[in-house]
């Protein structure tokens, strides 16, 4: 058996060896932290995903050892495979930072300001992306595209106005169900997720489209408006389910289970089971088993300390202790990229900006930003 070929790739001055055929995004995720580009459409468990949202664009400053020429344009890291000796710039490239801010602006062009009422708030990838890479104002002055809400069966509601057309739910239905009944209708600005004659989604695994949606476009009707994720305690649990893996996260408040989701990793994707298969869960586990006595509780879910979900969960509430080590100590000596000066990085929460003093809609031209003051 021949040995596996390894390529040496450098991402933001950090070198790692990965197998041939690995994408830049996968290599960056092995390094972790801010080095990994954001991804709104790519999902490692879904074949064919990626290449649509362009949020993972990176700069390749050196193609390979054999051909050291830089690539002339930014490339999608989720689709571009590494070459031996390749050098990639992500957060260290001004081109990437500027392009990503533009992509976020496009994604938010028709997106409603529903965060205060959206069930996805607190775990929304678009919310995180706009906070880290977005701008503090909008230049769009025209009427936004809107759609009516649709019930896609008794468990799922579609808010098409929030959708970013990442296609994740389409790939999920293609690969987990026998027959997909929803997809992308129309083209261009009129494109939307829909079913034929408003047919309901009733497959036993269709609830997984809620977990893969990076925004609040597909929501769980059984959890709708009932609670905020940062008030709930995520607990790992399992049951002997004949249909699926049975490995879930219970979101509790007191003794009440508000919702059940599949377990997710640090990238917001479905975790693999011990057998190495994706841990998709069935509708029975997701929607019908809402009592703690239905499950074997394994213990508290590990939470990223910087997540809003972690608030109030330290000092024993989830069996956790408040961390005392510094950020650099747990990130190989690297300082936090965004926490160094978040106002300068994203122009969000700029202290000198008082939107209430502006007459009419606030735009970038109505107040000075950090970039103007630089």
Language model features with spans:
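N-terminal cofactor/phosphate-binding cores enriched in small/glycine residues
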Residues: 7-9, 13-84, 94
């Amino acid at each position: 058996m021949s040995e596996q070929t390894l390529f040496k790739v450098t991402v933001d001055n950090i070198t790692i060896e990965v197998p041939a055929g690995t994408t830049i995004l996968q290599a960056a995720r092995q390094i972790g932290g801010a080095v990994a580009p954001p991804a709104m459409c790519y999902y490692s468990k879904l074949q064919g995903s990626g290449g649509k949202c362009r949020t993972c664009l990176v700069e390749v400053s050196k193609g390979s050892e054999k051909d050291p020429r830089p690539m002339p344009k930014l490339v999608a890291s989720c689709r571009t495979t590494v070459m031996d000796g390749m050098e990639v710039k992500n957060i260290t490239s001004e081109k990437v930072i500027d392009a990503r801010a533009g992509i976020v602006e496009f994604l938010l062009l028709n997106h409603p300001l529903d965060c205060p009422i959206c069930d996805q708030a607190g775990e929304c990838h678009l919310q995180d992306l706009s906070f880290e890479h977005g701008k503090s104002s909008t230049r769009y002055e025209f009427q936004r595209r809107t759609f009516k809400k649709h019930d896609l069966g008794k468990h799922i509601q579609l808010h098409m106005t929030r959708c970013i057309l990442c296609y994740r739910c389409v790939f999920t239905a293609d690969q987990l169900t026998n027959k997909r009944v929803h997809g992308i209708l129309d083209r261009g600005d009129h494109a939307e997720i829909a079913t034929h004659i408003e047919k309901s989604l009733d497959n036993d695994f269709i609830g997984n489209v809620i977990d893969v949606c990076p925004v609040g476009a597909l929501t769980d009707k059984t959890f709708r408006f009932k609670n905020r994720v940062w008030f709930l305690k995520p607990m790992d649990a399992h049951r002997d389910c004949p249909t699926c893996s049975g490995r879930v996260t219970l979101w509790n408040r007191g003794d009440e289970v508000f919702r059940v989701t599949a377990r997710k990793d640090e990238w917001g994707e479905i975790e693999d089971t011990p057998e190495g298969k994706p841990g998709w869960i069935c509708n029975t586990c997701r929607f019908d088993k809402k009592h703690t006595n239905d499950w074997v509780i394994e213990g508290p879910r590990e939470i990223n300390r910087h997540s809003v979900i972690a608030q109030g969960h330290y000092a024993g509430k989830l069996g956790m202790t408040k961390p005392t080590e510094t950020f650099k100590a747990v990130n190989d000596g690297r300082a936090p990229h965004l926490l160094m000066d978040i106002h300068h990085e994203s122009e969000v929460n700029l202290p000198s900006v008082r939107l209430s003093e502006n007459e009419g809609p606030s735009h970038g031209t109505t107040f000075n930003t950090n970039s103007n003051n630089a």
